[in-house]
């Protein structure tokens, strides 16, 4: 079963302007399946660079590689080409020679300066993550649901994650087996091998610490004392895991450096199913840490890289979404009562005076309240992104075409098409510049 991905509309626009497009993301997130579905009628070829013969030919004789694989084809999909010798220069040559190339990558090696420096202006990069909640519901054939069914669906998505193979498997034990295999492959191949990490035992302990350790801001001192590893090793592990789409680091939002912590990140897993298999948890309901991780990944999948806010007095807001209309503080709660907000959210509102704030709850508490002129909306995960888009409707500097486009998106229900008004403006302005 093929599930249409939310990046398709963006992808369709990009391929009209770029001869080279890279789709990057975690292993088994669906990159290859997505690109194969987009390959139109005609002469196309899919080339897997895990094959040592293919890799060797590309490394040693580019002309012969071109003749053997690319001649006569309108499009070539190059799977994991980025780790080949001198990949950036060779890809530049192929594109400048008129080749149309799509690339997949399971790590951000493709974004390394020694590769990307050759491809500036020639390549567009899209990120594909495991299924979002909306994609998950599509895969499950769920359209109109009662509240209990919707909650059960969300818990399944949170418990086992969004990797397509896991989602499309019904047996819970098989789901866990697939996740365990995926974890081991990602850790050994994508993290350890790609980034030259030899101490696998130490890396595994670090991954488990992130999954089960204390929530909140990552303290290098605490990790170092708990695991007996140096700050340098911690940083190397974090860099490798993030570049392999294993974790994501969320950094602080600040304006007053003297009052707020400005360096230490929070760490979340790209997929909550992966986190749970590492932590070996079998809960029947989410805890606060898991739900917070889930909200972070859902924001990420719709193009929003949030920040967090915390002062030295430990006043905190879980996520801060920066939008062109201003910042939106976002508090994550398993349960919330409309009319009551946490001290941290109230402090942020008093300090920064945002127009809007969100309290995202697991069981879908709904309602609104006013705090110092700020509209605080209580919603669930499914309504979170819609709320973020709708907040921009009141932006005073919006020109009519932006408002018209937003309304069209709202009517279609496809709220993942644009994650910010800036993205919307860029899309419209680029369209104006294209020759008719």
Where are these regions (language model features)?
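Conserved lysine of the Walker
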Residues: 31-32
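Pre-Walker A adenine-sensing motif
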Residues: 1-15
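Short glycine-rich substrate-engagement loop in P-loop NTPases that contacts/grips substrate
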Residues: 45-75
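Interdomain motor-coupling "hinge/lid" segment immediately C-terminal to the ATP-binding subdomain
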Residues: 106-108, 113-219
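Accessory nucleic acid-recognition modules appended to NTPase machines
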Residues: 172-327
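Hydrophobic anchor at the beta1->P-loop junction of P-loop NTPases
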Residues: 23
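Domain-level recognition of nuclease-like catalytic cores that cleave nucleotide substrates
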Residues: 365-390
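Small, basic N-terminal interaction modules of short regulatory proteins
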Residues: 384-436
